[in-house]
Amino acid sequence: MLDPKILRQNLEHVVEKLRRRGFEMDSDTFLQLENKRKEAQLAIQSFQTKRNQLSKTIGMAKSKGENPELLMAEVSQLNDELKQEEANFETIQKAFSDFQLAIPNLPHDSVPDGKSENDNREIRQWGAPPGFDFTPKDHTVLGERDNQLDFEAAAKLSGARFVVLRGSLARAHRALAQFMLDLHTDQHGYEEVYVPYLVHEECLYGTGQLPKFREEQFQVAGDRNFFLVPTGEVPLVNLARDEIIEAPALPKKWVAQTPCFRSEAGSYGKDVRGMIRQHQFQKVELVQLVQPENSYQALEEITRQAEKVLQLLALPYRVVELCAGDLGFAAAKTYDLEVWLPSQNKYREISSCSNCEDFQARRIQARWRNPKTGKPELLHTLNGSGLAVGRTLVAVMENYQQADGHIRVPDALKSYMGGVDYF
């Protein structure tokens, strides 16, 4: 959520920055709501002033032995009118809040202009795509051996965009997740956290998935108002809801492995085959809570930490900076990591690392105590995939494939795979 003060004091500036990301803010509606809010506030203050004056007059009348009955009736009438005006103010505040919740974050000044992923800017590449003396196979073909990658069984259980992993592929999937967790906890200083996979609606409002992306969420039937987590970012960031963290305890660095559930409502016809785009997938998520002045340094750090996974697995990748029009709803700046997939002869997204500044923190009131002032101030929140486990498995399968269809185990993964060289 944007700072209401910025909206009120620099509306034209906000409108222009939002226009960079392709969002047209209805400034007329904002001004109408703001005027109604001010009018209602003034009316409430006026009623309160009159009531206070009458209360004093009643007190004086009683002290003189006069009958204050008429004055008390007037106070009663004022109280009724005040309640009505307060209810009106609450309605206006709700409309104002709903309006604010629909506004995305402002892009950082360093974010390049652009409308779509075609306008994203490549920052760097790492590693060279492997050369094969045979035509490389798609991961779905590689997974046919011993039926280790079974989409038919998954369809029988759950429908399209699910997978059943068996044998060595299931073990490799587990090994990758464990490898990522060990790296981030042992070398990058993250605290591992186990979180619920069902969260309340307010958590999704807190991180920005709601209200805009409701159709992309899986909501649990019944009266409990539960949603399946679309990413580990949701429960991790919401751990700081309504908290005030002392400065010496910062930064908070949390990592969790969770399943992620997404309806992919806007992805009809995209990546229909395979494990690239699924309703359920595992992801190792990194979250940092930092002092505002440190957040862009933290963004570079979290991106390098996600890159380290790919480097240790010796998977070729590139880093791209998202243009303003391709930014996620809550992000002020984002780097995507894209891994090389030989069967597609191109890079595909495997991680997204974002600085949300105080956008999420304002929604959930996540604060730190500034020792200079002694007062609570909003934190900056960052998140990054470290990495998407299924897509990493796809990248390993395709980049390490052999002519006979077996997969060579990356050196960094061998200890997690029982020391085998191939699977």
UniProtKB/Swiss-Prot annotation:
Pfam families: Seryl_tRNA_N, tRNA-synt_2b. The keyword Iron does not apply. It catalyses: tRNA(Ser) + L-serine + ATP = L-seryl-tRNA(Ser) + AMP + diphosphate + H(+); tRNA(Sec) + L-serine + ATP = L-seryl-tRNA(Sec) + AMP + diphosphate + H(+). Pathway: Aminoacyl-tRNA biosynthesis; selenocysteinyl-tRNA(Sec) biosynthesis; L-seryl-tRNA(Sec) from L-serine and tRNA(Sec): step 1/1. ATP binds at R262, S263, E264, E349, I350, S351, S352. L-serine binds at T231, G232, E233, E285, S385. One of its GO terms (cellular component) is cytoplasm. The keyword ATP-binding applies. It comes from the Bacteria. Catalyzes the attachment of serine to tRNA(Ser). Is also able to aminoacylate tRNA(Sec) with serine, to form the misacylated tRNA L-seryl-tRNA(Sec), which will be further converted into selenocysteinyl-tRNA(Sec). This is Serine--tRNA ligase. The lineage of its organism: Bacteria, Pseudomonadati, Pseudomonadota, Gammaproteobacteria, Legionellales.
